[in-house]
Amino acid sequence: MKFRTAVLTISDSSSRGERPDLSGPAITQMLTPLSDIVWTGILPDDREQIAACLRRLADENQADLILTTGGTGLSPRDVTPEATLLIAEKMVPGIAEAMRAESMRITSRGMLSRGVAVVRGRSLIVNLPGSPKAVHECLSVILPALSHGIETLCGIARECAAQG
């Protein structure tokens, strides 16, 4: 199943045009063989704007998978996880745990990531880190399971037992 993906970059400087967005395009490049990229955008680190965008993308059934990049660290302006939790219906902690475990294998700073993964309606929303390198590392570890999760959300896959 080729799923529909929305990519939202969270960055004050990129939203003002002061710095190019490198992580959003990195996500798009990795997912293009597996997914139709149906929407991309850049927003500043603003909790309400992020939550409103995620809510709209999920509620209007625009994307099966919504990936954010940026705003998951400890900076006072990093609010992506909080915005995501504002609109969450279900938590999917294993995705964020897997990403942190992979990041910590590479650097102890991986434990400082606060990204979350949630479900709203029939959309799976995942917060990725802000650097292209970390995006690649995290997506590489979660991509094998994402298709099954999305198929389950969409009502295609019903069996969640281990398949190998």
Where are these regions (language model features)?
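Non-catalytic beta/alpha edge segments that cap or flank active sites
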Residues: M1-G164
